[in-house]
Amino acid sequence: MSSTKEIISEIKAFEPEEGNWLRLDELITELWEKGNPQVGIKELFGIFERYPKDDGFGVFWSILHGIETLEYEQNLYESLLNNPSYMGIIMLKRI
């Protein structure tokens, strides 16, 4: 299993191959299993910002539900100012 830092780096660099988002889903699971997902919150919002009109074939919903278990409001605000996204707007409406 990778370190938290390695997982976050992979999330930051992630690009779907031929529409396949499964590796991102695995990385999200690994990040939560490490027990301190808060350290990767900027990279998680970064996924929303890089793919602002996408839902990652459902993977973004896993990210959204995970983020909602954290202290995320300030990061959401910054993300929406930086690059508004479909998932960010959904999160704002859910507050």
Which positions does each model-derived feature cover?
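Alpha-helical interaction scaffolds
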Residues: 75-95
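Short hydrophobic interaction/assembly module
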Residues: 43-73
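Long, low-complexity, highly charged intrinsically disordered regions
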Residues: 1-27
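Structural detector for internal amphipathic alpha-helices that build alpha-solenoid repeat scaffolds
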Residues: 22-35, 58-69, 88-95
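Solenoid-like repeat scaffolds
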Residues: 13-17, 46-54, 81-87
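Extended interaction regions within the primary functional domain
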Residues: 12-14, 24-29, 59, 74, ...
